[in-house]
């Protein structure tokens, strides 16, 4: 599973000042970038993240994060996208349910209409959102790293997304905190926890199994992530390239 990408989440300054025990950057300077590399170590993209909005705090809250991606050889303007996160008792994870909120679906509809050179009316958007929601069913959640990691096993998770007659299932198994390591990247040197898991994705007649090994640092978030195929071959690496403090 693609890394996930990012971990630019912000929270109230009071919570941050009292106890910076979160796997996210400082909300006042939350802008950072990752290098995406293939299995041979060649850079395929640079992705820049920044916090667009935040509600609640890093214990229990949510965040909308903007990311911009451009291929190494591309001279075109990077496309802007958003990903949604939630904090649950200090653990942050991708909030898949947020993608199906009315305002988010409205943004997708506007983007699709704009690509066709048309503009949807508010009534048309409302009708489209209602029809989409009738076809969607979401259950479970994609778990992240706990606020206070302890070396040992972590709970498994399962996320199921149904759209009409299509079902996609994502399972995280063999999850564990396997150790600690000081890791150096272009952004600096960080004391990290190492998290490992096997991610199995099923959609229609296809099944994909990947193992991820991820390094997380307090006050930063994801520092590095290696993804391996089911045979143990390295297929991609995500590496922290820069961060504003």
Regions found by a protein language model. Give the residues of each.
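Solvent-exposed helix/loop surface patches that form functional interfaces
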Residues: 25-27, 84-190
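N-terminal leader/targeting signatures
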Residues: 3, 18-19, 88
């Amino acid at each position: 599973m693609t890394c996930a990408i990012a971990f630019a989440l912000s929270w109230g300054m009071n919570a941050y000042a009292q106890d910076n025990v979160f796997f996210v950057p400082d909300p006042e300077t939350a802008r950072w970038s990752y290098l995406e590399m293939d299995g041979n170590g060649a850079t395929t993209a640079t992705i820049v993240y920044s916090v667009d909005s935040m509600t609640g705090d890093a214990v229990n809250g949510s965040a909308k994060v903007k990311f911009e991606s451009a291929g190494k050889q591309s001279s075109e303007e990077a496309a802007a996208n958003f990903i949604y996160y939630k904090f649950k008792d200090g653990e942050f994870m991708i909030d898949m349910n947020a993608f199906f909120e009315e305002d988010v679906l409205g943004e997708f509809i506007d983007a699709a209409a704009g690509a066709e050179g048309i503009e949807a009316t508010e009534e048309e958007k409302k009708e489209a959102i209602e029809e989409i929601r009738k076809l969607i069913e979401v259950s479970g959640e994609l778990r992240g790293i706990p606020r206070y990691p302890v070396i040992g096993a972590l709970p498994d998770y399962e996320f199921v997304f149904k759209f009409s007659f299509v079902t996609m299932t994502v399972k995280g198994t063999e999850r564990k905190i396997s150790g600690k390591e000081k890791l150096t990247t272009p952004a600096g040197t960080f004391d990290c926890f190492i998290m490992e898991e096997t991610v199995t994705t099923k959609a229609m007649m296809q099944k994909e199994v990947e193992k991820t090994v991820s390094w997380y640092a307090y006050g930063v978030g994801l520092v590095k992530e290696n993804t391996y195929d089911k045979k143990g071959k390295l297929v991609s690496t995500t590496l922290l390239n820069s961060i504003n403090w």
